């Protein structure tokens, strides 16, 4: 699950600008597996987050990877280089169908946690300060912050856990996909099957 969110940098008492945090979340373990922060919305920074993620799976044979990269339809995620990186590494691509935030709910929730919990009340004046704070926040999120959705484990513990994780929160995206599949099946069932014409062939001898 991937997304980009903004963070305020104060230039003085009244003027400010934004920097942009790109993060990639493992939807299964809730672990932040890649991130990057930059001064613009250039594709370069989401690519850095993706490269951090790819480094973690470099020893997994390509044919054994069953990964799906999900994001909104931002130009960064649809860019030629970003798509090439995913396909080169055998990762399937999934994108939201519209602007409904529930279709990327886990990433949206992570943005909220990062900005309104882990970075709450912090006053940044440089990009370097933001980067240093993100390093600490990601470490805390992955290694110390317990999650109800993964049975009160930390994401790092969940990543190291053997067997299937017990997930407590429903996936709005999975519900959406199932609803679409059921709708398609209902339409298909309503279409009468056409019997192929039977042709009799006489062979002369």
Predicted regions and their residues:
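C-terminal domain-tail junction helix/linker
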Residues: 87-91, 113-205
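RNase H-like DDE/DDD metal-dependent nuclease/strand-transfer catalytic core used by mobile genetic elements
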Residues: 1-23, 27-135, 139-140
């Amino acid at each position: 699950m991937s997304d980009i969110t903004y963070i305020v940098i104060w230039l003085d008492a009244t003027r400010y600008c934004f920097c942009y945090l790109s993060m990639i979340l493992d939807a299964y373990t809730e672990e932040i597996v890649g991130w990057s922060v930059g001064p613009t919305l250039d594709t370069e920074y989401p690519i850095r987050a993706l490269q951090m993620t790819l480094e973690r799976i470099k020893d997994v044979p390509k044919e054994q990877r069953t990964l799906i990269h999900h994001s909104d339809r931002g130009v960064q995620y649809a860019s030629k280089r970003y798509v090439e990186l995913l396909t080169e590494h055998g990762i399937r691509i999934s994108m939201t169908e519209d602007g409904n935030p529930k279709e990327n709910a886990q990433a949206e929730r992570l943005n909220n946690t990062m900005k309104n919990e882990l970075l709450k009340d912090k006053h940044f004046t440089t990009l370097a300060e933001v980067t240093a704070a993100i390093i600490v926040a990601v470490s805390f999120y992955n290694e110390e912050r317990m999650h109800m959705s993964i049975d009160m484990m930390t994401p790092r513990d969940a990543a190291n856990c053997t067997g299937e994780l017990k997930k407590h929160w429903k996936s709005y995206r999975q519900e959406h996909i199932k609803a679409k599949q059921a709708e398609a099946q209902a339409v298909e069932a309503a279409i009468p099957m056409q019997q192929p014409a039977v042709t009799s062939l006489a062979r002369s001898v």
